[in-house]
Amino acid sequence: MEALVYTFLLIGTLGVIFFAIFFRESPRINK
């Protein structure tokens, strides 16, 4: 059960970082 929690936290952290970079780079690409 702990492995599932750690895996979820790892994927969630990577997802947040990727989303933050994509959201920050998005306006420049649209322009």
Swiss-Prot record:
What SUPFAM superfamilies does the record point to? Photosystem II reaction center protein T, PsbT
What's this chain's function? Answer: Found at the monomer-monomer interface of the photosystem II (PS II) dimer, plays a role in assembly and dimerization of PSII. PSII is a light-driven water plastoquinone oxidoreductase, using light energy to abstract electrons from H(2)O, generating a proton gradient subsequently used for ATP formation.
Which residues span the membrane? 3-23
Record localization = Plastid, Chloroplast thylakoid membrane
Pfam families, A to Z: PsbT (PF01405)
InterPro entries on file: PSII_PsbT, PSII_PsbT_sf
What the record says about family reads: Belongs to the PsbT family.
Source organism phylogeny? Eukaryota, Discoba, Euglenozoa, Euglenida, Spirocuta
What's the protein name? Photosystem II reaction center protein T
Keywords noted in UniProt: Chloroplast, Membrane, Photosynthesis, Photosystem II, Plastid, Thylakoid, Transmembrane, Transmembrane helix
Q: Does the keyword Chloroplast apply?
A: yes
Gene that specifies this protein: psbT
Q: Which organism is it from?
A: Euglena gracilis
